Amino acid sequence: MQIAIAGFLIVFSIGFISSSDQSNDKQKGAHVFGSLNATNLQPFVKNNYNWITIVPYSGQKNEDSPNLVYHRGNRLELDRRDSVWSHQIQVAHALGLKVFLKPHIWMHNPSEGKWRSDIFPTNEDNWDLWQKNYRKFILFYAKIAKKNNVELFCIGTELSRLTAEKSEFWETLIKDIRHIYSGKLTYAANWRNEFEKITFWKDLDYIGIQAYFPLTKNTYPSVEQISEGWQKHLLSIEQVHKKYNRKILFTEMGYKSTADSAIKPWEWIENYSNPKDLVSYETQANCYKAFFSQVWDKDWFEGVHIWQLRSDYSESDSTLNLDFTPQGKLAEGVISKGFE
């Protein structure tokens, strides 16, 4: 999922455990932008969420760069970051929320049409340096996960070319992480041309999917039309589940508040005033209704982390809000009811 990042951004995700027997263990989460505290977490708890995912970023110039920057290169900065993430984890745990730590790479200046799925160093020297830097980045956060008893850790997000061509690297990295961290592990694979091809699912606890599947070719689709669009994707998802005997976790899923949101759910809104981006809270709500009717109750389904909510949300934000957040919209009630 491509997003615009300004400054030092913290992303969170929250979920909760259902009272129904069939979904007692499902993760019920949503990515949330902004810092968290005991007060601004209450609306999420009220709406039946109880997992929180913290997303630390490492910066990379472009798809060819071997350098990853997640601190200023000194011990003081590392200690500060450790303190920030540890505090957020402790706030969540104090409220009874479980934590999913999910590192991402953000490219500052990618080539046209490229994003993090295209990251691939151009020669062996650059590859050696990139894997060394990525390993440091991931193990730094694995240590924070261990220190703070984090329940779930993500080894990477949407690095499609690297998972396809460098599987040995990931297998070794997983072993290195498990030497440090004893909790559950997953990887957040792109829905397109990645999750079916990964060979190291057997070494992880969940099959993670960034679930922006195209579900219709229609604007203003009905719940029935969107539900029909899920069928072919469910077949491929279930095949991977059966092959590796691992439950499926939607590490990310979301829909804009637009009439075309089920056509290409992964697309970010570039121009919020563009009249072609027609506001449709009903379409967003219909997308979630279809998800709960077609996916949620599958025995192989572990849960979902919805994109994206805000810790500083106010009701006035949603008046002309085309964005992914369900807050203050029809979808908010659909999700809350689905998570009961």
Locate each region found by the language model.
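Aromatic-rich peripheral "rim/lid" segments of glycoside hydrolase catalytic domains that contact
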Residues: E267-I269, S273, E282-A290, Q294, ...
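The substrate-binding groove and active-site-proximal loops of carbohydrate-active enzymes
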Residues: G29-H31, N67-D82, F120-R135, G156-E165, ...
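Boundary/entry segment of secreted carbohydrate-active catalytic domains
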Residues: S20-N47, V55
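Aromatic-lined substrate-binding rim segments of carbohydrate-active enzymes
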Residues: L41, S58-P110, E165-T186, E228, ...
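Aromatic-lined carbohydrate-recognition surfaces of secreted/lumenal glycan-active proteins
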Residues: F100-I105, C154-A164, E171-E196, N245-M253, ...
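Substrate-binding cleft and catalytic face of glycoside hydrolase catalytic domains
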Residues: N50-P66, V84-T163, W307-D312
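Aromatic- and acid-rich polysaccharide-binding/catalytic face
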Residues: I138-A142, N148-T157, A189-S227, K247, ...
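Bacterial Sec-dependent signal peptides at the C-terminal "C-region" and cleavage site
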Residues: M1-D25
